[in-house]
């Protein structure tokens, strides 16, 4: 065991040591591993692979070589790391779905879009791609500096003399210590055009560069959404670019469609994408898909998604975009090494760095070629003098004892150069002329003379020497012109860029869609008719309308809701999943919600408590729900009419309720013993019909009420009520232009005939026996509305709205229905159309749909007919209308035999 001498120990501060060591490690990772150089766009491992393949002669016009051999050369000479890291880098450079211009030409399995790994390196073969030669061209002309390799046995280039901006064309990605880079690939032609614009004008604005560089061009194609992310990335070096796969909608006939995905976003695993879609379907986050399969082959991507009948393909596609990587974002961080240090650069800075580097490369190459041309001209001048003085040259050589003596003698003599002075000046070789204006051979020239073949003494060879000298003089002049003129140098730079563009540029693969693409959540919601049911216990649910079946009047119905704890349904209406709704509570608060946010259930389900959906406080509960038009432009001319059980009404502007915070807002002030019965949108030219449970009704114009701006007002008296009576419904009707006499005359015509006239059948006004013109009869028939009244014992009737005369608000009303013990109290009054259907719900949860065309039209003062056959103790608690759907027609015949046509009139 060694005895440590205290004199050999140097105490250090551990914080300082960690700081220095960590920074050294961080810079090593940044400079030597993870971050590309802005000049050639390569990390050290990629640069070493290309240089090693070049040195080994593994060129594009040569045979493929085993990848294992290439990896071995790189690891042994330049990159002392694991072979898997080198091979992974080699594989990526060969993948046409990773690089816009692959730098390696691979043969064998080099992976796939499904995330399949490449075959082992012993099985695959590689060689340089043709475009890779443009990265390394002129490397043998002293264009870039070389550094010793890891053990000093070899030299490797610090950068490749790239002839095109590879950093932008192929992009790069990497994670270093404390920083990361993520540069997207671009179109070669666009990037070179931008470089040429910068060469022409170094002060060009970045936005002007964006005119030619439209945006990233990913090898997997796809669609870029909007330009804001592109502008941010190019202006600041950072940004987020939304990418979407390309999909087409194919009609299969019979109401069915299919979605065909032909392109996916960059770096998205196709197999994982298909799995994710399947997962979302299983979790019911994506609905409407009946079949999913991957039909991709060597010809391209094809993901086939077949939809169920009558499903809107655009909605399903939006759901796929939202829930999977078919739409993703590419976070741009244009970080690269500039002058050996990491820097986030904008588009102009990257292009400027590349152009500046190419200037250096072309300058170094020109200096190298100039020196080579001068060296060759120097030798040719010596040979020319020797040929002109061949006899003396031969004599000196013959007299010399050995080659060295001959060389020294040739160098010691001065030669007359009058006949070649123009050539000497032409090639600018001042080293040959002495003070006397004669020429002396240099050692290189003397050696070349001694090695000259006798055939050079012929007249033809003599002329060829002079011709070669003149050509070299032209080259030297051009090189000097390049070095002396930056304009000429930049001209060459542009010419070489354009040549690369002409040889390797391809059309843009990724398209760009302009506009804003902040996707509304409603774009993901399938438009579907829903039945919304609300219970006395505060439960709410939505059920697809297609879940219910049409029955005939008098049928027994089906179980629509499983009741617990004597909970009964208090409200039911039909709307679209996109229908906006206002929720009014017992304390006069209003909340806003879209229908699709309600819990989806089945006819037997109870739903969810509204207290779990809305931020209700304490004993607050929802008493009324008002569906609104989907198009908010229709709200401008609408008011809201409030009606309370005590007969109070209030007219407010609907726009006052357009913006409601999530915690709601005050809608109306209520007395303690009053409650909100109904809230409906209305227009100024319409009428309001208030109906009570005892069979009374009052009709008055909306315009007779002023708009009350105060949301805390309880309104004005709408109807005077008897002691035990209360308002149970409010109906909005069309305004009546006809006089009372005209209405009475019109109502004397049978309702069957009136319906025929409304349907467009011809009629003779004189045969009708009324004192009305044909035009008046036709106008009234087209404008006629019918009021449906339903009682708790299942009775109902339809009456013409013309039978309800207009009175002032505040009155006690007229008879709406003849109420008795058999009919029970009124539970619902509403306007109906001939093709409407009625949905009734009882306190036991039984539900039935009834076509209203089977309900007789009678006068106001009648008891109606049986709509619903009730069991003992059963009462109707809710009634709502359903617009006719195509599904009903298909089901009528199926259930016609099941349901007996019963009920008394």
Curated annotation (Swiss-Prot):
PROSITE patterns tied to this protein: TOPO_IIA
Enzyme nomenclature, EC number: 5.6.2.2
Active-site residue numbers: 123 (o-(5'-phospho-dna)-tyrosine intermediate)
Pfam families according to UniProt: DNA_gyraseA_C (PF03989), DNA_topoisoIV (PF00521)
GO cellular component, one term: chromosome
GO function terms (MF aspect): ATP binding; DNA binding; DNA negative supercoiling activity
Ranges for domain Topo IIA-type catalytic: 35-524
Keyword annotations of the record: ATP-binding, Cytoplasm, DNA-binding, Isomerase, Nucleotide-binding, Topoisomerase
CDD domains assigned: TOP4c
GO biological process, one term: DNA topological change
Principal cellular location given in the protein's record: cytoplasm
Biased composition (Acidic residues): 885-905
Subcellular location(s) per record: Cytoplasm
Annotated region (Disordered), positions in chain: 882-905
Catalysed reactions, semicolon-separated: ATP-dependent breakage, passage and rejoining of double-stranded DNA
Subunit structure: Heterotetramer, composed of two GyrA and two GyrB chains. In the heterotetramer, GyrA contains the active site tyrosine that forms a transient covalent intermediate with DNA, while GyrB binds cofactors and catalyzes ATP hydrolysis.
Record function comment: A type II topoisomerase that negatively supercoils closed circular double-stranded (ds) DNA in an ATP-dependent manner to modulate DNA topology and maintain chromosomes in an underwound state. Negative supercoiling favors strand separation, and DNA replication, transcription, recombination and repair, all of which involve strand separation. Also able to catalyze the interconversion of other topological isomers of dsDNA rings, including catenanes and knotted rings. Type II topoisomerases break and join 2 DNA strands simultaneously in an ATP-dependent manner.
Protein name: DNA gyrase subunit A
Organism in which the protein naturally occurs: Rickettsia bellii (strain RML369-C)
